[in-house]
């Protein structure tokens, strides 16, 4: 049986499923240069981290494609003409190439570990910074951009698509529509605020996705969201404090002060969430995933 | 006092050498540049200043490009969100780092034991992304933010402000007003496009006329390839009688880092600089102490 239908059967039987942990914050913690999502200089470490999560017992692997879209490059130039004038020669081709590479290394890690039953989730995320719902594009603008990303992930061979850290309902709807055009199953996950709502302030909607989750917020906020939206079936909070660097403007996944959430405490909290899908967002390590699994 | 001697050089028609790139030089030394590295690798930052001092720079600039309160705040939904999920010191880190930037430059200057005076320029730039004038805050907001930055620089001991990579007249005027309010000397550097106009579409003639009453000592062009900087100089020259400066970038922007190319080795860069016929010369991204050394020896 294909990996996703097998996972779906497990979920239908009421089993708990463990997702992996974060790529970005864990790679940065190990000194990886956060350029092209780490692929510019440290592709081997990306592969190795996927393997660590598999060894820790993750039932799902997520691609290292968070906040990877054309805007990440375009936003730091005046316009496309300026990008071609002073930018590195291949910036136009960067996103398609890295998305393909990200899926390839996730699949390679799965194959090498002999864990062929593990589905690979193609990660999609907000087109602007995940913590800035005020910058989110309109549905009409977002749809074609998400459609390209979904198509690239699908063509590279992911088993399903996971919309992470969505910060407005309208962009989530656009990304969901785009993802569904591939014919693959889709999960949608929202970033929430301390009020347990979507970071935009909207209530968490019930969307026509195969699963709905919350992520990208501290455990207490995640718990608040779960209490308000019983249709959520998964959660993967971040732990510690977001510590952005002094210069870089796009997303930079550095989290500090994570000591207050050692693996055992995290696993105990996760048990109380009472959802089928659990994993970890920024600050989480393979140790935490191992604790969740056991 | 050190600035007075730089100003005297300018008034006497002499060439003033500005330093070269710091951010890309940090990268070239195999250290990551997502952070300014002012606290994590002060040794590297100090060593780069030392290299530019040894190369013959009359003015060294602090490693504080785009380092503002806003740079931290804009990673979050709002201030409450920053306090809720952000690292504990994010509200004050900008000022701590600006002070650290001046301190490292001052330490390098003291350690160099030079006989000629060298001025430290507190480097500040656009409040939003340097190539995006469309994102610039309102003039009143900008002036208030520039003023708090200028205050920290003046208090930490910067000799002048280098307002660099400016892409609209509105931002330049806001920064100039802030500097004047503090009473610190200031220079303003604009990013030119291929035709020598600002990214906002405004002309350098308009920039010069708007700034003249605020009395910057030098207007410069930076953060663009040599050809564009040259185009900017030609646009500015008829409208600006005081000193003009230039410090283009070389290589290619490879977000968030830099792609070094061999298009402009020091000898070719020197030839370009001769053709600019300006009084202040230095280097932006991609330039190295070797570039500055040749400028200092030959110009």
Predicted segments with their positions:
Chain B
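Domain-level signal for soluble alpha/beta catalytic cores
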Residues: 1-299
């Amino acid at each position: 049986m294909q990996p996703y239908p097998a996972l779906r059967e497990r979920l239908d039987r009421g089993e708990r499923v463990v997702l992996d942990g974060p790529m970005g914050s864990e790679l940065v913690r190990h000194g990886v240069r956060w350029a092209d999502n780490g692929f510019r200089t440290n592709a081997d470490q990306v592969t190795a981290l996927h393997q660590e999560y598999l060894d820790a017992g993750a039932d799902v692997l997520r691609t290292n494609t968070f906040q990877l879209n054309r805007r990440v490059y375009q936003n730091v130039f005046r316009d496309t003409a300026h990008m071609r004038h002073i930018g590195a020669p291949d910036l136009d081709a960067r996103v398609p190439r890295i998305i393909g590479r990200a899926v390839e290394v996730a699949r390679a890690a799965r194959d090498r570990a002999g864990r062929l039953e593990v589905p690979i989730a193609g990660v999609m995320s907000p087109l602007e910074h995940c913590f800035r719902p005020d910058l989110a594009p309109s549905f009409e603008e977002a749809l074609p951009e998400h459609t390209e990303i979904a198509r690239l992930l699908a063509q590279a061979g992911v088993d399903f698509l996971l919309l992470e850290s969505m910060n407005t309902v309208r962009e989530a709807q656009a990304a969901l529509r785009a993802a569904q055009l591939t014919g693959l199953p889709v999960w949608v996950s929202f970033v929430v605020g301390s009020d347990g709502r979507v970071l935009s302030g909207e209530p968490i909607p019930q969307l026509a996705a195969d699963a709905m989750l919350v992520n990208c917020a501290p455990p207490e906020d995640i718990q608040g969201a779960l209490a308000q939206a019983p249709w959520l079936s998964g959660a993967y909070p971040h732990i510690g404090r977001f510590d952005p660097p002094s210069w870089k403007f796009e997303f930079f996944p550095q989290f500090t002060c994570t000591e207050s959430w050692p693996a055992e405490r995290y696993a105990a909290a996760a048990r109380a969430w009472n959802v089928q899908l659990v994993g970890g967002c920024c600050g989480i390590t393979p140790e935490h995933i191992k604790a969740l699994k056991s | 006092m050190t600035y007075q001697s730089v100003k005297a050089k300018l008034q006497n028609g002499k060439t003033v050498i500005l330093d070269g790139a710091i951010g890309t030089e940090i990268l070239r030394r195999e250290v990551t540049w997502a952070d300014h590295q002012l606290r994590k690798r002060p040794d590297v930052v100090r060593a780069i200043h030392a290299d530019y001092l040894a190369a013959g720079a009359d003015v060294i600039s602090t490693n504080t490009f785009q380092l503002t309160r806003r740079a931290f705040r804009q990673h979050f939904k709002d201030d409450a969100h920053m306090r809720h999920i952000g690292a504990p010191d994010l509200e004050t880190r900008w000022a701590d780092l600006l002070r650290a930037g001046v301190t490292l430059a001052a330490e390098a200057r003291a350690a160099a034991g030079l006989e000629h005076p060298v001025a430290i320029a507190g480097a500040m730039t656009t409040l939003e992304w340097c190539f995006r004038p469309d994102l610039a805050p309102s003039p009143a907001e900008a002036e208030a933010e520039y003023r708090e930055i200028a205050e920290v620089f003046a208090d930490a001991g910067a000799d002048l402000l280098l307002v660099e990579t400016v892409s609209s007249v509105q931002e330049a005027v806001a920064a100039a007003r802030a500097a004047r309010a503090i009473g610190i000397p200031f220079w303003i550097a604009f990013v030119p496009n291929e035709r020598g106009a600002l990214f906002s579409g405004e002309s350098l003639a308009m920039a010069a006329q708007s700034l003249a009453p605020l009395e910057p000592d030098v207007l410069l062009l930076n953060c663009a390839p040599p050809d564009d900087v040259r185009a900017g100089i030609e646009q500015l020259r008829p409208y600006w009688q005081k000193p003009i400066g230039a410090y283009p970038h070389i290589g290619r922007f490879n977000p968030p880092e830099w792609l070094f190319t061999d298009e402009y080795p020091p000898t070719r860069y020197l030839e370009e600089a001769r053709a600019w016929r300006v009084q202040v010369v230095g280097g932006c991204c991609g330039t190295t102490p070797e570039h500055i050394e040749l400028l200092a020896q030959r110009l």
